[in-house]
Amino acid sequence: MKKATVGAAVIGAATVCAVAALIVNHRMRKSSKWARAMAILREFEEKCGTPDAKLKQVADAMTVEMHAGLASEGGSKLKMLITYVDNLPTGDEAGVFYALDLGGTNFRVLRVQLGGKDGGIVHQEFAEASIPPNLMVGTSEALFDYIAAELAKFVNEEGEKFQQPPGKQRELGFTFSFPVMQTSINSGTIMRWTKGFSIDDAVGQDVVGELAKAMKRKGVDMRVSALVNDTVGTLAGGKYTHNDVAVAVILGTGTNAAYVERVQAIPKWHGPVPKSGEMVINMEWGNFRSSHLPLTQYDHALDTNSLNPGDQIFEKMTSGMYLGEILRRVLLRVAEEAGIFGDEVPPKLKSPFVLRTPDMSAMHHDASSDLRVVGDKLKDILEISNTSLKTRRLVIELCNIVATRGARLAAAGVLGILKKMGRDTPRQGGLEKTVVAMDGGLYEHYTEYRMCLENTLKELLGDELATSIVFEHSNDGSGIGAALLAASNSMYLEDKS
């Protein structure tokens, strides 16, 4: 009996030891996995590092590329496109002007009434329409006839107060957000289509000419006074309300910048010197690339798998289209190598672009004690349930690394423009105020990103100079800005003067 009791005790003790060993082993494996997750995070953080010295190198490289792009066509990764906009709004414009904004599968028609000096925008209204899929791959005539018909409907429904005097044409600013080789303020050749459009017979044609023919067919008596892209429109919209605006930056799905340059500093410009002596340059800065950019393995993989490998590198590090995707790629590696989401890698995490930047922003801004928003997003988007608080904190840290790098690089880009304009150092006679007009959903809605960008530029400029550089949100440049450029380039300006 005693032997049996002793034997049972020995077996019981052995079982307890075995269970304890399993628990210890499990904890060790869990600890090892977490250590691996943290190692991946710290490595990523280091590779994404943007100390001030590096950002100043990026800014210097941006300035060098700007000079090269202004010197000759194809001389730089930056196209530095001449926009033929040499006459920006002053705030004195008066009258009713229109805008057509074609940037994707939807287009808008706007009417803006300007009140003249100190009058501002008295009235504005718009109509929006979707482009049927068959017209996106049809003929030029079919597409522009459809647009002109909607424009005619918009004009026909307006009240008597917007009627033009006899013999006077309505004037339109046309925002066309596809690749165009601009040949004047109101003409430009379509180079190619993007965003799901493929209309072969329009390529090589003057986009304003195609619209003008369609308007004539539909009985719309309207003249296109300005052909612009959304960044130039943002600059114009900002200039209308703040005379010190000299730079515009869009940070949304994509990114771009435009600024006011002295014509004498544009060697590739062979036309007459405009009265203003200035010209707006569309940088197409999303295509900027430099050895100083802190690229990681995730950036290289994203670029390789993209539709345009080797192009738009700056955009792929800073804009809303890509930030969420970079985060997804890092989370995928953490899941594969550290198993923080379980033994199996969540299938959804393997889907490119499933994690959008607005969702990343929502997680980054989660201030709840249990980080509930992070948990909900992981569950709803990636189908990852029951995440620990520690895991959610890791996700927020990764969000912060991705957003901080993007925002600080965007700030370095702005510094590069200011350096090219000679506004990065105090001038004789005191500081010159420079307003940077900003637009785009990323800038507007991703608060952490916006604050980081603005604070970084202040750091780079120093306390004294930072007071002279101001960011202003210029909303809807692609619409209102185009109407304002129609006003500032009106054929009737000389009559008024």
Curated annotation (Swiss-Prot):
Bilayer topology term: Single-pass membrane protein
Q: Identify the metabolic or biological route this protein is part of.
A: Carbohydrate metabolism; hexose metabolism; Carbohydrate degradation; glycolysis; D-glyceraldehyde 3-phosphate and glycerone phosphate from D-glucose: step 1/4
Which organism was this protein described from?
A: Nicotiana tabacum
Q: Which family does it belong to?
A: Belongs to the hexokinase family.
Which of UniProt's keywords are assigned here?
A: ATP-binding, Chloroplast, Glycolysis, Kinase, Membrane, Nucleotide-binding, Plastid, Plastid outer membrane, Transferase, Transmembrane, Transmembrane helix
Broadest EC class assigned to this enzyme? transferase
Physiological role: Fructose and glucose phosphorylating enzyme.
- Stated EC number for the protein is 2.7.1.1
Region of interest (Hexokinase large subdomain), ranges: 229-476
Residues the entry annotates as binding D-glucose: T194, K195, N229, D230, N256, E284, E315
- Which cell locations does it reside in? Plastid, Chloroplast outer membrane
UniProt-recorded name of the protein: Hexokinase-1
Q: What is its main location?
A: plastid
Q: Which GO terms describe its cellular component?
A: chloroplast outer membrane; cytosol; mitochondrion
